[in-house]
Structure formats: C-alpha cells, structure tokens
Swiss-Prot record:
Domain of life: Bacteria
Name of the protein in question: Glycerol-3-phosphate acyltransferase
EC number: 2.3.1.275
Family the entry assigns: Belongs to the PlsY family.
Function noted in UniProt: Catalyzes the transfer of an acyl group from acyl-phosphate (acyl-PO(4)) to glycerol-3-phosphate (G3P) to form lysophosphatidic acid (LPA). This enzyme utilizes acyl-phosphate as fatty acyl donor, but not acyl-CoA or acyl-ACP.
Keywords from the named record: Cell membrane, Lipid biosynthesis, Lipid metabolism, Membrane, Phospholipid biosynthesis, Phospholipid metabolism, Transferase, Transmembrane, Transmembrane helix
MF terms (GO), sorted A to Z: acyl-phosphate glycerol-3-phosphate acyltransferase activity
SMART domains according to UniProt: G3P_acyltransf
The reaction(s) this protein catalyses: an acyl phosphate + sn-glycerol 3-phosphate = a 1-acyl-sn-glycero-3-phosphate + phosphate
GO annotation, biological process: phospholipid biosynthetic process
Any Pfam family matching the protein: G3P_acyltransf
Compartment(s): Cell membrane
Length: 216
C-alpha cells in the first residue's frame, strides 16, 4: 500500500516538472509566461526559445507521461492500473505544484502515456496527428482533432478488432479523460481557429486559410 501511495505521488510530481518554464528561466533568462501565448508548453517554447529548447521541452514532457505509466513496473506495484499513474502525470503537467498550478496543454505528456500503455494505438494517433498537422498547419487543430479521433477510435476499434482487439473500459475512460483535458486546455485556440486567426507552423497546406497576422 505504501509503495502504491509513493508511486502515485511520484507520478504527479513527475508530471509537475515545468520543463519549458525552467528551460527558459535557467538557460535563456526568460519567463515564457511573459512571451507569445504565455503558455509553458512545447509550441510556445519553440516559438520563443527556438528549436533546441522546443525539442528538449517536447521530449521531456513526452517522457514524463511514459515514465509515469511505467512506474508500477519499476516499483513493483500491483492492483493499480498503469493508466492511473499516467493520468496523474498529465494532471501534474496541467496543474504543476512547482509552477503555481499553471501548466501546459497536456498534449505531449498524454501522448507519452498512450505510448507507455498501448504503443500500437500511439503510432496510429501519431499518423493521424501528422496528417492533420500537414493539412491544417496548426498544432492546436491537430491536437484537438486527434483527441476527438482518439475517443472515437477507443470506442469503435474493438468492434472490428483493429489495433484494440477487445474492449478495455478503463483504457477507454482514461482516453476520454485525456482527450477532454486536451480539448478544454485548447479553448482559446479553438476560438482563434473559428476567427481564422490561429498561429501557424511554417509548412503545410493551411486548408482553413488562417491569417494570424490579422490579429496584430
């Protein structure tokens, strides 16, 4: 029991590491909350601090989710699903104790959780994400639509035995929870997409014809 409690606390604390914020403060003497979107996640880190910092932020945030999901194996914990540990890491990332409970949008960490529990489902979602990203040129749109598709896929794939051979109710509930967190954390982005003013990446088709310059 004590091992389980320690593991759950560690999962939350692991998720609470504010990677982008600390990289900005330590290596660039910048507080990401004062630049760009004010978010401390991967996208704003790329935009404000550059490719190296953005890549490091993504990698660490991603691995937080995977490592937390694998904690039960490392600590020999039984009786609690690895997905619980992964969810706690995502909650920690979103509401980090080390950063005033103001965290990121949970995309990278959620992806890490999925990899840690279902690698095949992760690969499928990466293909979906990359396809939407190319078509729309927006990380936010790719994140939100991938979250919606993840829910639908978790519900429908077991019916045909594709990727998910049988229903796992708890896995489905966790996927729904992670997806809802991602969607809710992107509510401002969704509004900008509706207004055609969302920020773009420098490649892709931009099929929705966003014009972020119009908001300046």
């Amino acid at each position: 029991m004590m091992n389980t409690i320690i593991g759950l606390i560690l999962a939350y604390l692991l998720g609470s590491i504010p990677t982008g914020l600390w990289i900005g403060q330590i290596f660039f003497k910048k507080n990401l909350r004062e630049y760009g979107s004010g978010n401390t996640g991967t996208t704003n880190t790329f935009r404000i601090l550059g490719k190296t910092a953005g890549t490091a932020t993504f990698a660490i945030d991603f691995l937080k989710g995977t490592a937390a999901t694998l904690l039960p194996f490392f600590l020999h914990i039984e009786g609690v699903s690895p997905l619980v540990f992964g969810l706690l890491a995502v909650i920690g990332h979103t509401f980090p104790i080390f950063a005033g409970f103001k965290g990121g949008k949970a995309v990278a960490t959620s992806a890490g959780v999925v990899l840690g529990f279902s690698p095949a489902f992760f690969v499928y979602l990466i293909v979906i994400f990359a396809s939407i990203l190319y078509l729309g040129s927006m990380i936010s749109l790719a994140s939100v639509l991938s979250a919606v598709i993840a829910i639908l896929s978790a519900l429908l794939f077991p019916l045909v035995g594709f990727i998910l051979p049988s229903y796992d109710l708890f896995f489905t509930l966790i996927i729904i929870a992670l997806a809802l967190i991602i969607i809710l954390r992107h509510k401002d982005n969704i509004q900008r997409i509706k207004q055609k003013k969302e920020n773009l990446i420098p490649w892709g088709l931009n099929i929705t014809h966003q014009n972020p310059e119009a908001k300046k």
